[in-house]
Amino acid sequence: MKLSNKAFVSSILALCMVLSLVITTYATTRASAHLDSYRASLTPKSSSRIAITVDVDGTGLMDDIGATKIYVYKSTDNEHFYLLRTFDSKDYPAMMKHNVYYYYDTPIIFQGVSGYYYYAHVDVYAAKDGGSSTRSYTTSSVQASNNPSTTQIAE
């Protein structure tokens, strides 16, 4: 019977260790005092256009929330990328919203070149009562195509 008790206690300790990892993982998903979560993605569209979607969740009602800058990179081989263009929220006001809990939009659609690869580095932002938080997110690369139904995310 003692073996069963040892096995039971060992199982409980193992479960506690696994749960502590889950709690640690959850704690790291909260980005900052103002950013609850954030992500961005690129989507190939028709005629080699690329859409940039940004999703930013605030920790409450934010004075300002969205993306401050979006850096777009281009490659012919999906290995060697160079900076193609920078989008700034000062020039593209659709990249930022005011007095909302979250930001979810596709503020930028740019013209790509069929066969070329693109990824974006997005600086997300949230501000409330004079305090603010900024974090960065890098998307997966996608390939521009004249026929996006055959385009897949490049890994």
Predicted regions and their residues:
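Short, surface-exposed binding/anchoring microloops in extracellular/periplasmic proteins
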Residues: L35-K74
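Bacterial N-terminal signal peptides
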Residues: S11-S20
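Solvent-exposed serine/threonine-rich low-complexity stretches and specific carbohydrate-binding patches
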Residues: K69, F81-H98, T138
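Short, solvent-exposed, Trp/other aromatic-anchored flexible loops in extracytoplasmic proteins
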Residues: D91-H121, A127-K128
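Bacterial N-terminal signal peptides that target proteins for export
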Residues: M1-I12
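Sec-dependent signal peptide cleavage junction
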Residues: L19-H34
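Short beta-strand elements
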Residues: K128-E155
